């Protein structure tokens, strides 16, 4: 009789899966086998930054400005206690530009209205002050607040036409001013209640950026376009085309 073969219990073998190695991109580890590259952090380019207390607000609260609030049939306006042409622009204009970062009434109203009044009456007093205006402009834009960006763009458009050579004087400062414009250039969607009132108020951020860049090119001299293009690669010339 043939001998029966005794079946042994089936042995199980554990298969060890290779552990994934998490690594940063563009490193030696990232090229190793079983390496999983960690994705980039969320950029937050459009994220609004918190505003800091402005020097403009402190000066206003101390009563350092020769201004008062006046009401008429058209609404609020600034009553200047001195002739605007006689103001010390080196002192006052940078302070008012510092107020571009304000969003609270009456500070934001006085800063914005005051800037436009001073640009309207400044003449040749404006050009020498340009270097002092760059940091307040940059600070306002860097808050990434849509309303503040729109207000600052309108101020920049007024600034370049306020006096001769101002547009050209801004050219060395494109690196400070234009990066935020490059980020928001294609943002043309109203983020409010679904009804787009923005074009009526000229609050359409993408259009305002386009208008501002065109103003920079028109008044910035022959090197303006190439310098704008360097900072905002999608910009196309309004003069060459």
Curated annotation (Swiss-Prot):
One of its GO terms (biological process) is spermatid development. It comes from the Eukaryota. Keywords: Cell projection, Cilium, Cytoplasm, Cytoskeleton, Flagellum. One of its GO terms (molecular function) is G protein-coupled receptor binding. One of its GO terms (cellular component) is sperm flagellum. It is found in: Cytoplasm, Cytoskeleton, Cilium axoneme; Cytoplasm, Cytoskeleton, Flagellum axoneme. Pfam families: ParcG. Microtubule inner protein component of sperm flagellar doublet microtubules. Forms a large molecular chaperone complex containing heat shock proteins 70 and 90 and chaperonin components. Interacts with STIP1, PRKN, GPR37, HSPA8, TCP1/CCT1, CCT2, CCT3, CCT4, CCT5, CCT6A, CCT7 and CCT8. Interacts with MEIG1. Microtubule inner protein (MIP) part of the dynein-decorated doublet microtubules (DMTs) in cilia axoneme, which is required for motile cilia beating. Suppresses cell death induced by accumulation of unfolded Pael receptor (Pael-R, a substrate of Parkin). Facilitates the formation of inclusions consisting of Pael-R, molecular chaperones, protein degradation molecules and itself when proteasome is inhibited. May play an important role in the formation of Lewy bodies and protection of dopaminergic neurons against Parkinson disease. This is Parkin coregulated gene protein homolog. It comes from Mus musculus.
């Amino acid at each position: 009789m043939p001998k029966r073969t005794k079946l042994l219990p089936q042995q199980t073998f554990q298969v060890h899966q290779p552990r994934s190695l998490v690594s940063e991109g563009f490193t030696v580890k990232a090229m190793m086998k079983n390496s999983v590259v960690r994705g980039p952090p969320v950029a937050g380019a459009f994220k609004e930054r918190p505003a800091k207390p402005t020097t403009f607000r402190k000066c206003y609260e101390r009563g350092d400005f020769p201004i008062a609030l006046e009401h008429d049939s058209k609404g609020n306006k600034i009553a200047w206690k001195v002739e605007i042409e006689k103001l010390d622009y080196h002192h006052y204009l940078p302070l008012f530009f510092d107020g571009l970062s304000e969003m609270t009434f009456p500070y934001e109203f006085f800063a914005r209205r005051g800037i436009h009044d001073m640009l309207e009456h400044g003449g040749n007093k404006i050009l020498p002050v340009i270097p002092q205006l760059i940091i307040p402009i940059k600070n306002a834009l860097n808050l990434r607040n849509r309303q503040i960006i729109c207000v600052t763009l309108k101020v920049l458009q007024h600034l370049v036409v306020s006096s001769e050579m101002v547009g050209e004087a801004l050219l060395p400062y494109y690196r400070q001013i234009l990066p935020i414009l490059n980020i928001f250039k294609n943002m043309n969607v109203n983020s409010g209640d679904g009804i787009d009132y923005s074009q009526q108020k000229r609050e359409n951020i993408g259009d305002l950026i386009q208008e501002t860049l065109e103003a920079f090119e028109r008044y910035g001299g022959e090197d303006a376009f190439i310098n704008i293009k360097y900072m905002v690669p999608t910009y196309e010339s309004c003069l060459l085309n």
